[in-house]
From Swiss-Prot:
InterPro entries xrefs: ExoRNase_PH_dom1, ExoRNase_PH_dom2, ExoRNase_PH_dom2_sf, KH_dom, KH_dom_type_1, KH_dom_type_1_sf, NA-bd_OB-fold, PNPase
One Pfam family matching this protein: RNase_PH
An individual GO BP term: RNA processing
Enzyme class: transferase
Species per Swiss-Prot/TrEMBL record: Polaromonas naphthalenivorans (strain CJ2)
EC number: 2.7.7.8
GO annotations of cellular component type: cytosol
Protein name listed in UniProt: Polyribonucleotide nucleotidyltransferase
Lineage: Bacteria, Pseudomonadati, Pseudomonadota, Betaproteobacteria, Burkholderiales
């Protein structure tokens, strides 16, 4: 009799077999599911505190996706030989799981919840993110914690005009899209994607396809819950204090309506904070006992009602715009004198200073991924200091939000970058958000594109991004173009679209409510396209095309190709030749296995000298060609002649003169410069030379 009460569910999901198990591992967690998807195995666990902390006014959910190197049969490369801080992929996957599950916890549930996912085994063809999403959904669903799930998720590729469910890593290389969608049976909640300039129709089709396929996983989770689910918590949302709400409305509503007539963000924020202070003072004056956190929540609800009702009634938005207008745009290129490329992109009260730096291949980021090491020649880093919103706060290493925003901007630009053959530089773009009032990640896309073009990167097209919002009440809805920060907090959907005039390159969507239909998404995408075209027009006015030359302060890269068999000649014994070349010419030289050599230098003369010397070292001896060289050694049967650096040929005694030569030293001496003709080379690369082939044959005199 086993001590385990193990329950297993298996299902076929496209090309993959998926097995979910519970009851054997991590039995003390609130919920634990071991999921195997064709050899990629993840363990998702969920634990929730039984009570919320007193005074808690937000939902403390944490999601940690952790990859173990043993999953790929590897030992960590760090000094301590154990896993350290999360990689960028782990951070992004943690966010990917957090985003669709967070809206499904009931309003007023403030108990701490922690979801931890360990990747225990990895099939390089099956990335861990989709298995982790499904396992997390299953673990939450069987735990009994208040959760309006389960959710399903799927990855969608677009290959040869067809949607492909959960493609392998190799298949993805041939896809023009990499899209992840997650949602409940009824509604899409989250989309994260990159694409190679695809139309709105194709992207929407992928979302619908992925959502339908995700329901296969949801059905399997329902079966697991039926057989292994724990009792649902006896939890009820705290009863609302209707008397206190009425008093707060009476004290604050008119003042908040007036505050939301103020167009300037800073002044409006100051006014709403004053309303909060006055409301609390008014309640005290009336002798009402209250919890300050609860009152602030009530005021937020009033603000949301004011803003939402005004927009649905067709009134102007917070800053006076209608639903389709983009805020005023200002663009300035080459802002910084000594950087390789820079742009200042301002849209209303959101501003990004974006700077591009060009480097050599040695500057590429080496990524030690679980599925294999690789190099990344394009980096985009996003920073948002607290002063951007007029606040104080911690400054230091990037937070999850900053990593996520940087990745989104990178996804948007990567489709239009030149190939390595067209532009061999490593590129690093840094977006410094200097002001923020909504959509700073999309400002980073616009500024990033302009900054790259300013640096002389031959982009295939301009890329612009726009953040959209949605407010929905029953059958009424309004799609908002270029949302403000307040509209983001008070709205029902936040989605960001980036692309060119030809199509979408990145799409991110987060939906907070059920009932967003395909038709609503269609309207939103069409309105986003209209805004994107407007911004692209402004960008093209500011900078029609990339600068023809890179900055004077950027390294110049010169590429040449040699026979791969000659690489060892260029490197030399113990690296002596390449070291001497770089030191004597003042250049950086990078050699690839296929014989591609990249020379980096700010001085074209130095680069030309390095090229000339490499050409000499790698030159092939040509049969029939005449060379001038010094004799390096005298032999009994001839002499060795240096034809070019590192290449000698044999001048046989019979090829010195037309007459018979008894002693080589009668004709030649070491160090003597002579002209010789190449007769042949054998299969081992040995070269046979002749002097007499260049001499006139003596006349034959008859006596």
């Amino acid at each position: 009799m086993s001590i385990f009460n193990k329950v297993t569910k298996s299902f076929q999901w496209g090309q993959h077999k998926v097995t979910m198990e519970t009851g054997e591992m991590a039995r003390q967690a609130g919920g634990a599911v071991l999921l195997d998807m064709d050899g990629t195995v993840v363990l998702a666990t969920v634990v929730a505190k039984s009570d919320a902390k007193p005074g808690q006014d937000f939902f403390p959910l944490t999601v940690d996706y952790l990859e173990k190197t043993y999953a790929a049969g590897r030992i960590p490369g760090s000094f301590f030989k154990r896993e350290g801080r999360p990689s960028e992929f782990e951070t992004l996957t943690s966010r990917l799981i957090d985003r669709p599950i967070r809206p499904l916890f009931p309003e007023g549930f403030f108990n701490e919840v922690q979801v931890v996912i360990h990747v225990l085994s990895l099939n390089p063809e099956v990335e861990g993110d989709i298995p982790a999403l499904i396992a997390s959904s299953a673990a939450l669903s069987i735990s009994g914690i208040p959760f309006n799930g389960p959710i399903g998720a799927a990855r969608v590729a677009y290959i040869n005009g067809e949607y492909v469910l959960n493609p392998g890593k190799t298949q993805l290389q041939n896809s023009t899209m990499d899209l992840v969608v997650a949602g409940t049976e009824a509604a899409v909640l989250m989309v994260e994607s990159e694409a190679k300039q695809l139309s709105e129709e194709i992207m929407l089709g992928a979302i619908v396809f992925g959502h339908e396929q995700g329901n296969i996983a949801i059905n399997a989770i329902h079966e697991l819950v039926r057989d292994a689910g724990k009792p649902v918590w006896d939890w009820k949302a705290p009863a609302k204090d209707e008397v206190l709400i009425a008093k707060v409305v009476a004290l604050a509503e008119e003042k908040l309506v007036a505050a939301y007539q103020i167009r300037n963000k800073q002044a409006r924020t100051h006014a709403t904070r004053q309303v909060t202070t006055w409301t609390k003072m008014g309640l005290k004056a009336e002798g009402v006992e209250f919890d300050g956190v609860a009152v602030e929540g009530m005021l937020f609800d009033i603000e949301a009602k004011i803003v939402r009702s005004q927009i649905l009634a067709g009134d102007p938005r917070i800053d006076g715009r209608d639903t389709r207008t983009v805020r005023p745009i200002e663009i300035r290129n080459s802002v910084l004198p000594r950087t390789h490329g820079s742009a200042l992109f301002t849209r209303g009260e959101t501003q990004a200073l974006v700077v591009t730096t060009l480097g050599t291949e040695r500057d590429a980021q080496r990524i030690d991924a679980l599925s294999g090491d690789y190099e990344d020649r394009f980096m985009l880093h996003y920073n948002m200091p607290p002063f951007a919103t007029g606040e104080t706060g911690r400054v230091g290493s990037p937070k999850r939000r900053e990593i996520g925003h940087g990745r989104l901007a990178k996804r948007a630009l990567i489709a239009v970058l030149p190939s390595k053959e067209e532009f061999p530089y490593t590129m690093r773009v840094v977006s410094e958000i200097t002001e923020s009032n909504g959509s700073s990640s999309m400002a980073s896309v616009c500024g990033g594109c302009l900054s790259l073009m300013d640096a002389g990167v031959p982009m295939k097209a301009h890329v612009a991004g726009i953040a959209m919002g949605l407010i929905k009440e029953d059958n009424r809805f309004a799609v908002l173009t270029d949302i403000l920060g307040d509209e983001d907090h008070l709205g029902d959907m936040d989605f960001k679209v980036a692309g060119t005039t030809f199509g979408i390159t990145a799409l991110q969507m987060d939906i907070k409510i059920q009932g967003i239909t395909k038709e609503i998404m269609q309207v939103a995408l069409a309105q986003a396209k209209e805004a994107r075209m407007h911004i692209l027009g402004k960008m093209q006015e500011a900078m029609g095309q990339a600068n023809a030359e890179v900055s004077d302060f950027a390294p110049r890269l010169y590429v040449m190709k040699i026979n791969p068999e000659k690489i060892r000649d260029v490197i030399g014994k113990g690296g002596a030749v390449i070291r001497a070349l770089t030191e004597e010419t003042g250049t950086q030289i990078n050699i690839e296995e296929d014989g591609t050599i990249t020379i980096a230098s700010n001085d074209s003369a130095k680069a030309d000298e390095a090229k000339r010397r490499i050409a000499e070292i790698t030159a092939e001896v040509e049969i029939g060609k005449v060379y001038e060289g010094a004799i390096t050694k005298i032999l009994d049967f001839g002499a060795l002649v240096n034809l070019m650096p590192g290449k000698d040929g044999l001048l046989h005694i019979s090829q010195i003169a037309h007459e018979r030569v008894e002693k080589v030293t009668d004709y030649l001496s070491e160090g003597q410069i002579i002209k010789v003709k190449v007769l042949e080379t054998d299969e081992k690369g040995r070269v046979k030379l002749s002097m007499k082939a260049l001499l006139d044959r003596p006349s034959q005199h008859q006596g």
